């Protein structure tokens, strides 16, 4: 224990993990931060081992994946851990973001923390797309072609930008080399952002379910919450390894087990399941340029949350109307994902458009309006000393 507090390197570990003061009332939803750390470590380690055997060449990329699966000792486990780990990484991120929205973790004094988190999320999406292209199956090839071709919608420079990304006039060796290099490099940029995220967290401390200051009631992270995290780790690995060993291809497109062929178009080009909601928003807007803007805006719109939420109350536990619309938003997000997995035909296109409208309306109109309503009710109740707010909160 003395070494933990005297050694300059171990002191950081001690301050951030062992003796870090945490609110005494945080729930298991706060486990997802540490679970994301576990997912990130899994992706880094398995990714390094996969890179040792992968060949970024359009003629050999698919074969090198098969070589990893068939000839490398335990290569299939490493590949399935990396592929399924990406899906679990995003699932944990979505729950982590939902927790932040529900408990108001984006509000002052944690605006910097939230901003870095959104940037991390955006970078994760880019890294995930780059990795999706590398196996160079049918879905990888056509996904790369379609998604990168969206840049052509940018006025004046669009076509030149697409050719610059491809390194040619079509997806070629130059493209897959660039994607592989960036897919290997960007996780280390992501690691730097994660460190910034932890610094921001350490500066103001964790939020808590009540959304109030917990300075008077904090306890050390270890052993009280580290053991709580161990329960989360065990549950996570139980589910994760079930997918890895028993249903490793459940979340994988079957077309990606066919070598990429630029002369044959798949019946449907869809991204990984964790990007489907944003793909739906892209597809729901008929104009190509506006669709691209809408897709990017759907990701970056989380940045405006600290500024549009004007409610005097932080936590949704005490905001019954916000709670109702939050659950509607979650269901709407799942609907967007479901629509993205279906063909662009009626009635899916109409449902996707209405869901996309609600998605943006939630951030731009509903949250500010709810803040005005809640502040008005709060001031009336405080002035008249009536139990109406208490009644509504328990009824809803």
Swiss-Prot record:
The keyword RNA-binding does not apply. Binds 2 heme b groups non-covalently. Keywords: Electron transport, Heme, Iron, Membrane, Metal-binding, Mitochondrion, Mitochondrion inner membrane, Respiratory chain, Transmembrane, Transmembrane helix, Transport, Ubiquinone. One of its GO terms (molecular function) is metal ion binding. One of its GO terms (cellular component) is respiratory chain complex III. PROSITE patterns: CYTB_CTER, CYTB_NTER. This is Cytochrome b.
């Amino acid at each position: 224990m003395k070494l933990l507090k005297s050694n300059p390197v171990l002191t950081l570990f001690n301050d951030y993990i062992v003796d870090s003061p945490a609110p005494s009332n945080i729930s298991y939803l706060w486990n997802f931060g540490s679970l994301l750390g576990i997912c990130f470590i899994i992706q880094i380690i398995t990714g390094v081992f996969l890179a040792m055997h992968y060949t970024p060449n359009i003629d050999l990329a698919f074969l090198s994946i098969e070589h990893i699966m068939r000839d490398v000792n335990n290569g299939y486990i490493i590949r399935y851990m990396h592929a399924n780990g990406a899906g679990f990484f995003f699932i944990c991120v979505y729950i982590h973001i939902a927790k932040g929205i529900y408990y108001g973790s984006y509000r002052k004094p944690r605006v910097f923390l939230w901003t870095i988190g959104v940037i991390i999320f955006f970078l994760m999406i880019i890294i995930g797309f780059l990795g999706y292209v590398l196996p160079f199956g049918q879905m990888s090839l056509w996904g790369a072609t379609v998604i990168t071709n969206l840049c052509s919608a940018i006025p004046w420079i669009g076509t030149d930008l697409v050719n610059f990304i491809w390194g040619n006039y079509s997806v070629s060796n130059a493209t897959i080399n660039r994607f592989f290099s960036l897919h290997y490099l960007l996780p280390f940029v992501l690691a730097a952002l994660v460190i910034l995220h932890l610094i921001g967290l350490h500066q103001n401390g964790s939020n808590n379910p009540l959304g109030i200051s917990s300075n008077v009631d904090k306890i050390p992270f270890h052993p009280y919450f580290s053991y709580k995290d161990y329960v989360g780790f065990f549950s996570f690995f139980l589910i994760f390894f079930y997918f890895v060993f028993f249903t490793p291809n459940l979340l994988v497109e079957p077309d990606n087990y066919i070598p990429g062929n630029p002369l044959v178009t798949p019946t449907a080009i869809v991204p990984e399941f964790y990007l489907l909601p944003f793909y739906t928003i892209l597809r729901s807007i008929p104009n190509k340029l506006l669709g691209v803007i809408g897709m990017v805006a759907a990701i970056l719109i989380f940045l405006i949350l600290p500024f549009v939420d004007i409610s005097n109350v932080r936590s949704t536990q005490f905001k019954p109307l916000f709670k109702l619309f939050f659950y509607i938003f979650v269901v709407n997000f799942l609907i967007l994902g479901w629509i993205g997995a279906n063909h662009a035909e009626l009635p899916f296109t109409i449902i996707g458009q209405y869901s996309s409208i609600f998605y943006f309306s939630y951030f731009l109109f509903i949250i500010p309006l709810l803040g005005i309503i809640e502040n008005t009710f709060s001031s009336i109740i405080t002035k008249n000393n009536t139990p109406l707010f208490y009644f509504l909160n328990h009824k809803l």
